[in-house]
């Protein structure tokens, strides 16, 4: 803490029945000190007021200037005490410091101390006042200041009551997701990997059924239905679906066999029709060749009969 000798300012010594009080102010920005800060001097005296009423002192605070230096200092005189409020303000805590009625406001200057001369039984208190503009600027700076990064929470062990009689009453509260670690005693946590495996097996089964029922000659059947993990099929539904797929395969196989039989019958019909055509042609040729012989034979027989006659 600095002393008055550090400033090398020759302030006068305290007079009889007086004492010198020095106030050192913290350094601020020069513009802020000049325009936004003020110091209120509150001289007073210690008097115990048992009734709890609010009292004040009469007196004066005069400003004087140090010769050949131009620095101000203040001289306080205290007179009588009088009650400023008749009703007790705080009977349980009676006042012990009675302030002066007039408390002057002086400029804020941290470059030099504030020197006040008061009576020996008096005391000087002070209060620093700031304008609303400075308060707004400070609030804006607090809002614009970067937020302090919060550290990761550490798991905390808490011992809880165990009314159900489980073997492990200690519960560890961690930062994990509730789907993995949030479960009660005796319950198993959710396992997403098993559901994914089950859905993959279901989709592979449906693809196998469709591949077995298809052939190069028939139209392949593919299952485009995807089973989500949270709605997996039960065993009965899987058996029913496999039966339906097998029935579809059987009907598809019967249709293919029917088509093959139809194609073979059509081929046979074509072969039969060709054979019949050949037989008819031969028959027609045979009839054509035999008809003149039949017509010639009776003529020949007639000629022979005539000759014989």
Curated annotation (Swiss-Prot):
Compositional bias (Basic and acidic residues): 156-167, 181-190, 261-279
Bias (Polar residues): 209-221
Short name of one Pfam family: Ecotin
Positions in coiled-coil regions: none
Annotated spans, Disordered: 140-309
Highest taxon of the lineage: Eukaryota
Composition skew (Low complexity), residue ranges: 168-180, 196-205, 290-299
Molecular function in Gene Ontology: serine-type endopeptidase inhibitor activity
Gene3D superfamilies xref list: Ecotin, Ecotin, trypsin inhibitor
Family: Belongs to the protease inhibitor I11 (ecotin) family.
UniProt xrefs under PANTHER family: ECOTIN (PTHR35890:SF3), PTHR35890
UniProt-recorded name of the protein: Ecotin-like protein 3
The organism of origin for this protein: Leishmania braziliensis
């Amino acid at each position: 803490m600095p002393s008055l000798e550090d400033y090398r300012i020759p302030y006068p010594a305290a007079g009889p029945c007086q004492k010198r009080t020095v106030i050192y102010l913290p350094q601020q920005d020069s513009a802020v000190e000049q325009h936004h800060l003020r110091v209120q001097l509150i001289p007073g005296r210690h008097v115990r007021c048992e009734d709890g009423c609010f009292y004040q002192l009469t007196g004066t605070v005069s400003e004087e200037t140090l010769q050949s230096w131009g620095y101000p200092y203040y001289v306080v005189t205290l007179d009588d005490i009088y009650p400023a409020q008749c009703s007790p303000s705080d009977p349980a805590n009676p006042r012990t410091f009675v302030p002066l009625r007039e408390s002057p406001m002086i400029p804020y200057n941290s470059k030099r101390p504030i020197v006040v001369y008061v009576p020996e039984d008096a005391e000087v208190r002070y209060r620093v006042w700031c304008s609303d503009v400075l308060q707004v600027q400070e609030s804006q700076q607090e809002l614009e200041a970067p937020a302090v990064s919060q550290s990761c929470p550490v798991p905390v062990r808490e011992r809880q009551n165990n009314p159900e009689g489980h073997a492990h009453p200690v519960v560890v509260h961690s930062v994990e997701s509730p789907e993995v670690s949030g479960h009660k005693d005796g319950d198993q946590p959710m396992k997403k990997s098993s559901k994914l495996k089950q859905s993959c097996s279901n989709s592979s089964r449906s693809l196998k059924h469709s591949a077995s029922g298809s052939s190069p000659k028939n139209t392949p059947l593919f299952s485009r239905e995807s089973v989500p993990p949270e709605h997996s099929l039960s065993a009965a539904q899987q058996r029913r679906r496999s039966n339906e797929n097998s029935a579809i395969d059987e009907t598809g196989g019967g249709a293919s066999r029917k088509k093959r039989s139809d194609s073979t019958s059509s081929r046979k019909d074509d072969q039969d029709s060709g054979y019949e055509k050949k037989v008819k042609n031969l028959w027609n040729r045979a009839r054509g060749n035999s008809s003149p012989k039949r017509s010639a034979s009776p003529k020949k027989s007639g000629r022979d009969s005539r000759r014989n006659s």
